[in-house]
């Protein structure tokens, strides 16, 4: 709880033992404003969410065993031969019917004389619960709980656990109670035996014995002691629930001579108050024959699993008691799925109105073969009439033919006539879908749209609520999907479809034109200006710029015309012009170099990984301006001292560390990437953002938002990763976290305390203050991201850094993003091939394998790979070499093109500079410790002014300075610049012998300063004025034809032969040399301040009192590079 009495979402989810997503969903249902897991809400709102979540968990609480209420027959559902329970569908209560204690009916001889005793009979259709007191029905022998003697109707459970299809008819009044009949003599006393419903085909058997397959028999009402209940703990919901039949049990009254059951009168439609037991995902629809192993009373297979129920029960109206109007008793049983491939067309009969069927996807269990007789022939299930229904295939969500499509309410289903042909003139349900598909020229091979068949589907959706309602809606929609039609029926399509096909042939070209016009019209109508545009190669044509700005090219040409530039649509514009035009339209411009490097271009998780994903540690990149305390913050997290050992106290590499912390009582790992903050290391920061899952933006509380802070924000946005702001140095004087929040809000980063969604944590790295809170926020943010990877595949990842070690050879820092990297794996990193010889982590501990989100240093590459390239492990070296060869040729062509572009100089400009003597070149050979440093130095050299001095880098590579480098420098007159590297044996001696200048640096600041000084040294020096002093004319003396000015030196000094300017008022009357300087009739070289002297010039004699003489001299000065 916060100090203001509010509660965070993640604290509320922790109290309730739920995920943050569930609490956020509940808040959204209650219209409570909560943007993320760390949002704050009031205690009242928290109480509403708690009550809603507790109400949503009530059905789960009701599933626990409780003492049954008087008059309720609580039944347990358990598969025979299994010790575990599975939830079962509650059965509708019999309205106002009281029945005596029933016992399993004694088996009688089957009526069919053709059936031998040894052959197991196929289970028949389940009997519905009867309203008569003399006949009770249950799909299978239930296991009975305790029940009081009083017989009361069982109350209906809440519709949340068993949504039913409601029918808009008046409610049926309760039926009159039927007097209870006396129980047979064999029944036990009422007080000693619990009451249960007896199925007519149940036979007394031991409780633990597997059920035997029953024979068709005449129902006989007897009572017997119920079987002993197994020791397994039942799970019941609400009302009496029959054990889920492994196949449809024998139907009562199905034979031709069976008596019609007594039905209590009711005004409601038949079957409106009944439901049928729920089937699992692999169960057949009611009325369909049963496969072996699923028939009622059939011995279960050894090791059978507990029955699983998929989804929620679906009411099938009229399925409870077919004798009441769903189908006349004694009639032939209709086929469960209509005309199936193995069923005669005449076997199907219409379904009663309001009947709803459900198709469910198989839940991954293998199909069960059809039942077989001992001689190997398939068993024909015995029905309840003279006709029998052959076994059919198990229905799935996508049946093989339209004959298995779900029926419409009222019994009509297209194509259900004899032979599977649809009625002539009857419009098909998916004609509109076909017309749309033909218009869009999309192939009909794909699965068609899901159509919900039924008139009262809204009532089904209305009853489906709560947290589990969304899942049930999805299952229901899939179950009612109409399947695609076979090719034979598509050929015999009605006339409208044929007309559309003819039109399609005639209008192909017109349709293409129409679609092009629609796209153009939509683009013109949209006219939405982008937030920013990214210029790929520092130039764009007018048409390309117009497309990016979503304006007409004529608008761009008009804008340029008013600026004095005559342009055409194909003319290329340089970067300043693009920025000027884009700013006129209110769109900022970004260069593509860095933003493209920060975008995540390769998806590391492939489709085959989806079944094997596990949670992986998050990768956190620490970014920010230089000297804002990024490495110190990581030191506080790791409890190490890295920053103290860095040259100049600044980070110049990407450091990869893995930290293990305690969170919610369990160890959690975080992989940190520490990026440099200096402006030269832009590419390094972009690479760090490309592989990260969350970015930590470090901002100093005493310095605020700086240029590299803005750059880091743009990197994180380009990579589309969440940002957590750490406001560091809050312990310093002058620290103002609120000022930092204000500056960040100007960059659209609004703190949660101010109503935004960005987590901002004030920390102190030096005093380790609020470090735990920062780590907790990082874990909470990454939990929402749901980071996963597949560790059971070959590794893939990114090269974070690479360098050449003189002892180990090429070394690369690899971040494994998916899979597991092992010693001996063949790795291809861009155009570089390697075989992992050894791996070490950030603590220099050797590893044999590295899982997802691990950063390791790997040895064994053939050359130094390029930082930022993706690497991938291949099963053998042959396949890896083939991939690397193609990449190497592409990289070579790209490198040559870049070199030619960098050396492209205008011949006229070069000859003009050569004639003027202004063409200066500084040749460099650059060697650094790692690839990232080489990139940073080259990028910084590109920023230096090149108007008068050209910098040519003849060679740039990671590694030590060799004797070959010295020979190249001697031949080209180059300077060797080393950065954090050493010289090989013999290189120093060769450099001294050839007079090659070798410079070594360990801080990038000093390196760039010296190179700029060397470039300025190539420039010609310039003459500048240096002030000497001033004097005032107080008297004028005429000597011959010339005149001498008697002066008093006010400031500085006067020197003989210096330059002077004579000021008279605001006008300069003379500028020239001072030829004569005397004091007391003696020639002197200079006169200091406070002395009088005589000043004479050969070319000026018009002195006047009050003139001011300014003395200066011209000196040579080293030129500076101008931008």
From Swiss-Prot:
PROSITE patterns: G_TR_2, IF2. Residues 624-631 are annotated as: G1. GTP binds at residues 624-631, 674-678, 728-731. CDD domains: IF2_eIF5B (cd01887), IF2_mtIF2_II (cd03702), mtIF2_IVc (cd03692). SUPFAM superfamilies: Initiation factor IF2/eIF5b, domain 3 (SSF52156), P-loop containing nucleoside triphosphate hydrolases (SSF52540), Translation proteins (SSF50447). Residues 320-339, 412-422 have a biased composition (Gly residues). Residues 674-677 are annotated as: G3. Its main location: cytoplasm. GO terms for cellular component: cytosol. Residues 52-452, 480-512 are annotated as: Disordered. One of its GO terms (molecular function) is translation initiation factor activity. Residues 54-73, 94-113, 121-133, 193-206, 285-304, 486-499 have a biased composition (Low complexity). Residues 500-512 have a biased composition (Basic residues). Belongs to the TRAFAC class translation factor GTPase superfamily. Classic translation factor GTPase family. IF-2 subfamily. This is Translation initiation factor IF-2.
């Amino acid at each position: 709880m916060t100090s203001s009495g509010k509660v965070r979402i993640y604290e509320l989810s922790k109290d309730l033992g739920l995920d943050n997503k569930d609490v956020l969903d509940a808040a959204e249902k209650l219209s409570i404003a909560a943007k993320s897991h760390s949002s704050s809400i009031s205690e009242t709102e928290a109480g509403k969410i708690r009550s809603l979540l507790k109400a949503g968990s009530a059905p789960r609480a009701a599933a626990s065993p409780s003492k049954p209420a008087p008059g309720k027959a609580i039944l347990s559902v358990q598969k025979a031969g299994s010790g575990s329970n599975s939830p079962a569908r509650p059965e509708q209560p019999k309205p106002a019917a009281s029945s005596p204690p029933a016992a399993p009916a004694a088996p009688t001889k089957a009526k069919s004389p053709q059936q031998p005793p040894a052959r197991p009979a196929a289970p028949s259709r389940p009997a519905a619960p009867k309203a008569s007191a003399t006949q009770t029905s249950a799909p299978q022998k239930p296991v009975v709980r305790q029940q009081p003697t009083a017989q009361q109707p069982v109350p209906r459970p809440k519709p949340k656990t068993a949504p039913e299809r409601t029918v808009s008819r008046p409610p049926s009044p309760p039926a009159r109670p039927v007097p209870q009949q006396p129980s047979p003599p064999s029944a036990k006393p009422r007080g000693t035996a619990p009451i249960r419903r007896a199925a007519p085909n149940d036979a007394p058997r031991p409780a633990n014995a597997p059920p035997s397959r029953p024979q068709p028999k005449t129902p006989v009402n007897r009572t017997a002691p119920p079987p002993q209940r197994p020791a397994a703990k039942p799970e019941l919901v609400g009302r009496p629930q029959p054990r889920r039949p492994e196949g449809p049990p024998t139907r009562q009254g199905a034979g031709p001579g069976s008596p019609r059951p007594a039905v209590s009168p009711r005004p409601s439609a038949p079957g409106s108050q009944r439901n049928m037991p729920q089937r699992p995902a692999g169960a057949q629809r009611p009325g369909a024959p049963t496969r072996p192993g699923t028939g009622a009373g059939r011995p279960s297979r050894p090791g059978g699993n507990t029955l699983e129920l998929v989804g929620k029960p679906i009411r099938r109206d009229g399925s409870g008691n077919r004798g009441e109007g769903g189908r006349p008793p004694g009639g032939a049983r209709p086929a469960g799925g209509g005309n199936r491939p193995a069923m005669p067309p005449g076997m199907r009969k219409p379904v009663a109105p309001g009947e709803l069927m459900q198709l469910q996807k198989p839940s991954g269990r293998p199909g069960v073969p059809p039942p077989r007789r001992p001689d190997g022939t398939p068993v024909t299930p015995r029905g309840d009439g003279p006709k029998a229904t052959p076994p059919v295939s198990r229905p799935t969500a996508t049946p093989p033919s339209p004959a298995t499509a779900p029926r419409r309410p009222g019994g009509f289903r297209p194509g259900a006539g004899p032979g599977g042909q649809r009625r002539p003139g009857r419009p098909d349900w998916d004609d509109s879908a076909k017309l749309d598909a033909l218009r869009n020229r999309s192939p009909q091979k794909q699965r068609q749209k899901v159509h919900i068949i039924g008139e009262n589907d809204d009532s089904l959706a209305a009853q489906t609520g709560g947290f589990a309602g969304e899942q049930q809606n999805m299952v229901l929609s899939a179950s009612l999907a109409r399947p695609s039609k076979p090719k034979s029926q598509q050929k015999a399509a009605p006339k409208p479809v044929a007309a559309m096909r003819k039109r399609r042939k005639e209008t192909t070209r017109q349709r293409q034109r129409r679609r092009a016009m629609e796209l153009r019209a939509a683009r013109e109508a949209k006219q939405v200006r982008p937030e920013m545009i990214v210029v790929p190669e520092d130039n764009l044509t007018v048409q390309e710029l117009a497309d990016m700005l979503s304006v007409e090219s004529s608008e761009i040409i008009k804008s340029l015309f008013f600026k004095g530039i005559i342009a055409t649509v194909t003319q290329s514009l340089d970067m300043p012009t693009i920025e000027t035009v884009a700013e006129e339209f209110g769109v900022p411009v970004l260069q593509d170099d860095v933003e493209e490097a920060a975008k995540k271009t390769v998806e590391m998780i492939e489709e085959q990984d989806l079944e094997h994903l596990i949670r992986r540690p998050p990768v956190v990149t620490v970014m920010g301006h230089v000297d804002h305390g990024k490495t110190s913050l990581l030191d506080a997290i790791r409890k190490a001292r890295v920053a103290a050992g860095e040259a100049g106290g600044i980070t110049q590499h990407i450091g990869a560390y893995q930290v293990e912390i305690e969170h919610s009582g369990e160890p959690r790992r975080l992989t940190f990437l520490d990026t440099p903050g200096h402006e030269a290391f832009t590419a390094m920061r972009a690479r760090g953002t490309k592989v990260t899952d969350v970015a930590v933006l470090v901002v100093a509380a005493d310095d605020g938002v700086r240029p590299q802070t803005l750059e880091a924000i743009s990197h994180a946005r380009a990579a589309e990763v969440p940002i957590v702001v750490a406001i560091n140095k809050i312990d310093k004087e002058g620290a103002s976290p609120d000022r930092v929040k204000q500056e960040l809000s100007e960059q659209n980063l609004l703190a949660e305390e101010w109503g935004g969604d960005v987590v901002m944590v004030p920390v102190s790295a030096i005093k380790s203050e609020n470090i735990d809170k920062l780590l907790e926020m990082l874990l909470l943010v990454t939990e929402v991201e749901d980071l996963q990877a597949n560790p059971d595949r070959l590794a893939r990842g990114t090269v974070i850094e690479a360098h050449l070690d003189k002892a180990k050879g090429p070394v690369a820092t690899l971040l494994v993003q998916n899979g597991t990297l092992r010693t001996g794996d063949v790795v291809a990193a861009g155009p570089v091939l390697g075989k992992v010889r050894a791996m070490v982590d950030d603590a220099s501990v050797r590893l044999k394998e590295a899982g997802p989100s691990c950063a390791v240093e790997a040895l064994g590459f053939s050359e130094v790979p390029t930082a930022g390239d993706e690497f991938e492990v291949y099963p053998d070296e042959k396949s890896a070499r083939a991939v690397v060869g193609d990449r190497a040729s592409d990289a070579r062509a790209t490198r040559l093109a870049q070199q030619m572009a960098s050396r492209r100089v205008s011949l006229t400009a070069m000859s003009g500079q050569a004639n003027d003597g202004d063409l200066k070149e500084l040749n460099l050979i650059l060697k650094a410790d790692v690839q990232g440093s080489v990139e940073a130095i080259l990028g910084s050299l590109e920023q230096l002014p090149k108007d008068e001095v050209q910098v040519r880098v003849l060679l740039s590579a990671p590694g030590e300075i060799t004797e070959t480098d010295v020979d190249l420098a001697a031949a080209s007159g180059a300077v060797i610049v080393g950065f954090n590297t050493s010289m090989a044996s013999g290189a120093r001696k060769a450099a001294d012998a050839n007079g090659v200048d070798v410079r070594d640096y360990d801080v990038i600041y000093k390196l760039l300063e010296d190179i700029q000084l060397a470039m300025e040294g190539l420039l010609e020096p310039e003459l500048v004025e240096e002030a000497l002093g001033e004097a005032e004319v107080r008297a004028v003396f005429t000597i011959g034809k010339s005149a001498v000015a008697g002066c008093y030196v006010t400031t500085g000094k006067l020197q003989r032969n210096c330059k002077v300017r004579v000021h008279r008022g605001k006008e300069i009357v003379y500028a020239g040399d001072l030829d004569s300087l005397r004091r007391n009739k003696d020639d002197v070289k200079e006169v200091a301040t406070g002395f009088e002297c005589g000043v004479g010039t050969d070319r000026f004699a018009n002195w006047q009192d009050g003139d001011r003489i300014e003395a200066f001299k011209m000196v040579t000065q080293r030129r500076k590079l101008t931008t």
